[in-house]
């Protein structure tokens, strides 16, 4: 039997059609068409289907979700918000705040180092010198797709990670500071662990530092990330801590 009006289709068919429509178009356009479409687009079922279809959850997903629509958007936006975290583009996107000694430098991970590093996609790192070297990056959340209401109402977890290592032949000191900033760049949350001092003749293994911001105040619009360090023997060259594979992610990770 021919259907003259799309609204005459069974609701389950309409829901299936909506799973193929981009999420922003559903909310900004389709939801305004009529009350039927609005009610269908607001159904939990639709957003669970979209999550499943796009691989954001698995068939056997059993974890509680407070709001499937928000969950979908957080999953779709989930990625590393720091650009050029592994020095593949030199110092592009980074601000060299303090460039002491022989200044910041990019080096390649050796074949042995690649075997030891937990991510085989990482091939380069940034290295510091005999006077303090610090570099930073500011993440503009709105520019990255995280609108103000989402950040203020949902306040999703913000996870920060960084990797650092010393040289086996020289001691070094590594430092990290991450701040959640308001629209006026006032700090609303800070993670600044004590500097990590690594002694000479250490194992030179790569170490991960991580922190999750939760239940922070509303108003977060930017994230400021700064790291670096210095060697503790003041040797000419690049004997300070090495850093790479830094990341800032928001919301639940992909399965």
Swiss-Prot record:
Keyword Transcription: no
Top-level division of the source organism's lineage: Eukaryota
Keyword NAD annotated: no
Lineage, uppermost ranks: Eukaryota, Metazoa, Chordata, Craniata, Vertebrata
Entries under PANTHER family matching the protein: F-BOX ONLY PROTEIN 44 (PTHR12125:SF13), F-BOX ONLY PROTEIN 6-LIKE PROTEIN (PTHR12125)
Domain F-box: 3-50
CC per GO annotation: cytoplasm; cytosol; SCF ubiquitin ligase complex
Role description: Substrate-recognition component of the SCF (SKP1-CUL1-F-box protein)-type E3 ubiquitin ligase complex.
Coiled coil feature spans: none
Swiss-Prot/TrEMBL GO biological process terms: ERAD pathway; glycoprotein catabolic process; proteasomal protein catabolic process; SCF-dependent proteasomal ubiquitin-dependent protein catabolic process
Tissues in which the UniProt entry reports expression: Abundantly expressed in brain and kidney. Expressed at lower levels in heart, spleen and liver.
Keywords: Ubl conjugation pathway
Additional remark text: In contrast to other FBA domain containing proteins, FBXO44 demonstrates no significant binding to any of the 200 glycans tested.
Record protein name field: F-box only protein 44
Complex formation: Part of a SCF (SKP1-cullin-F-box) protein ligase complex. Interacts with SKP1 and CUL1.
Signal sequence bounds: none
Domain FBA: 71-252
């Amino acid at each position: 039997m021919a259907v003259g009006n799309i609204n005459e289709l069974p609701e389950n068919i309409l829901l299936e059609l909506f799973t193929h429509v981009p999420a922003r178009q559903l909310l900004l356009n389709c939801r305004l068409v009529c009350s039927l479409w609005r009610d269908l687009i607001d159904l939990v079922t639709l957003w669970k289907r979209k999550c499943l279809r796009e691989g954001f959850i698995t068939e056997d997903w059993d974890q509680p979700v407070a709001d499937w629509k928000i969950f979908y958007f957080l999953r779709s936006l989930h990625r590393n918000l720091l650009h050029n975290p592994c020095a593949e583009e030199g110092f592009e996107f980074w601000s060299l705040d303090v460039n002491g000694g022989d200044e910041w430098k990019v080096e390649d991970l050796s074949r042995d180092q690649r075997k030891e590093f937990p991510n085989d996609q990482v091939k380069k790192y940034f290295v510091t010198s005999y006077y303090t070297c610090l570099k930073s990056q500011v993440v503009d959340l709105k520019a990255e797709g995280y609108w103000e209401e989402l950040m203020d109402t949902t306040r999703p977890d913000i996870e920060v990670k960084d990797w650092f290592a010393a040289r086996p032949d020289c001691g070094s000191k590594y430092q990290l500071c991450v701040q959640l900033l308001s629209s006026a760049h006032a700090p609303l949350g800070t993670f600044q662990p004590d500097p990590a001092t690594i002694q000479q003749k250490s194992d030179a293994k790569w170490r991960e530092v991580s922190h999750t911001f939760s239940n922070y105040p509303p108003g977060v619009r930017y994230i400021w990330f700064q790291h670096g360090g210095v060697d503790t023997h003041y040797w000419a060259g690049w004997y300070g801590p090495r850093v790479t594979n830094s990341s800032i992610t928001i919301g639940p990770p992909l399965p």
